[in-house]
């Protein structure tokens, strides 16, 4: 009863997952892409097929049967997502925030930066009050030609990696369903606890990882 094309994409995804999580994400995206286009084509109320709406339809379908059907299947994969994946998301969120803070045109930022912040508001709070603010202290992004130079000097490159890794570690815990404590960068060193809802966990994976990875693979090293 399962569409042949979707199954082949998923089998390909499982096969390459241990060695090439980037390709696994791409094959997984193709399965999702195929499923939501079939769904949109069968809905007469939808006049034009678009990726964002399609992914939202997939997310809504998963959430509708999350506890009864899908959680037991998908939860193990959420718990085993590799750290490299979270470094990828943390990196484009921090770079996007630095560019936005510096007034760099939106076209230079990854589109997933804006969409993920919009779908998971706590990420904006964490960036503004903690990781993004700290990252801005070492970054001075400027447009050079048709690219953005983040302006991080050699003395601060290790600090940049440390900030990205720490942020990625927090993101991984949030996706696992844990509550995390974030220390703000204010003088009082305010601490606040955050957690993701089930909808935010799925939004992070579908939009922040799979869709963002798809854009990166198709468009290369450009804002997409």
Regions found by a protein language model. Give the residues of each.
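Phosphate-binding glycine-rich loops and adjacent basic patches that engage nucleotide phosphates
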Residues: 18, 171-177, 199-207
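Residue-level detector of well-ordered alpha-helical segments, enriched
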Residues: 23-28, 73, 206, 213
């Amino acid at each position: 009863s399962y569409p042949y094309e979707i199954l082949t994409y998923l089998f390909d995804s499982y096969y390459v997952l241990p060695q090439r999580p980037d390709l696994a994400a791409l094959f997984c995206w193709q399965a999702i892409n195929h499923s939501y286009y079939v769904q949109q084509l069968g809905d007469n109320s939808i006049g034009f097929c678009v990726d964002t709406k399609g992914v939202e339809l997939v997310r809504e379908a998963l959430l509708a049967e999350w506890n009864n059907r899908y959680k037991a299947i998908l939860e193990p994969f959420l718990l085993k997502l590799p750290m490299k994946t979270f470094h990828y998301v943390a990196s484009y969120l921090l770079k996007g925030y630095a560019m936005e803070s510096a007034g760099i045109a939106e076209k230079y930022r990854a589109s997933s930066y804006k969409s993920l912040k919009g779908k998971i508001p706590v990420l904006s709070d964490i960036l503004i009050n903690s990781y993004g603010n700290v990252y801005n202290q070492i970054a001075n992004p400027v447009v050079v030609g048709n690219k953005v130079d983040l302006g991080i000097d050699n003395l601060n490159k290790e600090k940049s990696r440390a900030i990205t890794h720490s942020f990625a570690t927090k993101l991984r815990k949030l996706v696992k369903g844990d509550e995390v404590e974030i220390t703000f960068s204010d003088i009082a060193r305010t601490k606040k606890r955050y957690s993701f809802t089930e909808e935010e966990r799925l939004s992070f994976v579908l939009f922040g990882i799979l869709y963002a990875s798809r854009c990166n693979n198709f468009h290369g090293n450009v804002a997409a």
